[in-house]
Structures are given as structure tokens and as C-alpha cells.
Regions:
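Active-site bordering "gate/hinge" segments
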Residues: 1-172
């Protein structure tokens, strides 16, 4: 359950980033779509703990309360509709002429340079280095994800828009 809540929170965070990034680059629709999906996630969080943004549901030793009746089914229904729309959003954003014009060949960071600069997390993986603390680290997160198989989004060319062959929006 902790992994599920944590991953849903991560998705909500990435939706904000994706929407705001598109907005900064002149594409308004992806912002609205991303925030629509984020609202659905925040509704699920509110059901679980009464808060939408600053929830304190995960605590030492477990969770602060049981799930409300039917919550897992509502969460599963959300995830069933979420997966296909993420593919749509990816296409809507990364094939947008304005987005492509403003991002192509901008901010390329080689894996060597990323390591030399001490980059971590998504920036390091975006530069082609396959390291993820959920899988490779020694922390509470590694223990929490132990036994779960998941694909880590690692870009090949140091820049997301040139990795068009990568399916969907990798972090979501």
C-alpha cells in the first residue's frame, strides 16, 4: 500500500511538471489535461486521509488508517483510464510543433557530463545513466520496492525529445 500511495503521489507530481512545462513552452492543452488527471489523483488521496496535498498517510510502521471501502476499486478504475490518456498526452505534447521547435537540441547533457557535474535522479537517467535509488540504493525506498519489478525510464541520447521511440511518458 505504501508503494501504491507513493507511486500515485509521484505521478501527481509529474503531471504538474508535465503540464507546467508544456505551458511554459506555449502549449496550453497539455496543462489542462494533466491537471484534470491530477485532480482525480488528489480526490483519491483526500478519500484516504482527508487531505489533497499535504497528506500524512504513510507513517513509521505502516499507515495511519485503513483504506475506505471501495477505494482500491476506484483507484484501479482510475489507473485503467489513466494509462491510455498518458499516451495521448505524450503525443499531444511531443508532436506539438511549438514544443519541438523550442526543445530540439536544447539542454543536451551527455552521461559523462552529468556524472562529472554530480547530477542525480531524473537528470542523470535523462542523460542515459541507468541508476534509480528505488532499485539500486540502500535506503527505506529500496526496501519498500524490494520484490517489485519495474522499468526505469532511461533516455538514450541525453535529451528526451530525441528519444521518440521510448513508449509513453516514461516517468508516469
Amino acid at each position: 500500500l505504501r508503494v501504491l500511495i507513493t507511486e500515485l503521489n509521484r505521478s501527481a507530481s509529474h503531471l504538474v511538471g508535465m503540464g507546467a512545462y508544456g505551458l511554459d513552452l506555449g502549449t496550453f492543452s497539455p496543462f489542462l489535461y494533466a491537471f484534470r488527471e491530477r485532480e482525480k489523483l488528489l480526490d483519491l488521496f483526500e478519500e484516504v486521509c482527508g487531505a489533497r496535498l499535504t497528506y500524512s498517510y504513510i507513517t513509521v510502521g505502516g499507515m495511519t488508517a485503513d483504506l475506505p471501502p471501495g477505494w482500491l476499486q476506484r483507484c484501479e478504475a482510475f489507473l485503467d483510464q489513466f494509462e491510455p490518456v498518458i499516451r495521448e498526452y505524450h503525443t499531444l505534447l511531443t508532436t506539438n510543433a511549438i514544443f519541438v521547435k523550442r526543445t530540439a537540441n536544447i539542454g543536451v547533457l551527455s552521461s559523462e557530463m552529468a556524472i562529472d557535474y554530480g547530477c542525480t535522479g531524473p537528470v542523470l537517467r535523462g542523460s542515459g545513466v541507468d541508476i534509480d535509488l528505488r532499485r539500486d540504493g540502500e535506503s527505506i525506498y529500496t526496501a519498500m520496492y524490494d520484490g517489485y519489478a519495474f522499468e526505469v525510464a532511461v533516455m538514450k541520447n541525453g535529451h528526451y525529445p530525441r528519444d521518440h521511440e521510448y513508449p509513453a511518458v516514461p516517468r508516469l
